[in-house]
Amino acid sequence: MMLEHVLVLSAYLFSIGIYGLITSRNLVRALMCLELILNAVNLNFVTFSDFFDSRQLKGNIFSIFVIAIAAAEAAIGPAIVSAIYRNRKSTRINQSNLLNK
């Protein structure tokens, strides 16, 4: 694939994720959009690593770190959402003001 095609795909994924984060009122949907943004960043890391310096694996190593962080977020995020739902009976972002009380 050409570099431009992959960058356009990554920009679309990133834009959809940002749009979802801005407009989402649901915590689960916001977590999914955050994962989409992280995947777009991973795609950029791997693409630039392959295109500019194919012998070194710096971009691939960065993407492995981002995948590890995303896995931790995917494990902890739903647990936090579940705890908020048990306390507030809602997963809406504007109703989760746990620090105010």
UniProtKB/Swiss-Prot annotation:
Q: Which GO terms describe its biological process?
A: ATP synthesis coupled electron transport; photosynthesis, light reaction
Q: Which reaction does it catalyse?
A: a plastoquinone + NADH + (n+1) H(+)(in) = a plastoquinol + NAD(+) + n H(+)(out); a plastoquinone + NADPH + (n+1) H(+)(in) = a plastoquinol + NADP(+) + n H(+)(out)
Single GO cellular component term = NADH dehydrogenase complex
Protein name per its UniProtKB record: NAD(P)H-quinone oxidoreductase subunit 4L, chloroplastic
The task this protein performs is described as: NDH shuttles electrons from NAD(P)H:plastoquinone, via FMN and iron-sulfur (Fe-S) centers, to quinones in the photosynthetic chain and possibly in a chloroplast respiratory chain. The immediate electron acceptor for the enzyme in this species is believed to be plastoquinone. Couples the redox reaction to proton translocation, and thus conserves the redox energy in a proton gradient.
Which gene specifies this protein's sequence? ndhE
Q: State the membrane topology.
A: Multi-pass membrane protein
UniProt-listed Enzyme Commission number(s):
7.1.1.-
Keywords, A to Z?
Answer: Chloroplast, Membrane, NAD, NADP, Plastid, Plastoquinone, Quinone, Thylakoid, Translocase, Transmembrane, Transmembrane helix, Transport
Q: What's its top-level EC category?
A: translocase
Its quaternary organisation is: NDH is composed of at least 16 different subunits, 5 of which are encoded in the nucleus.
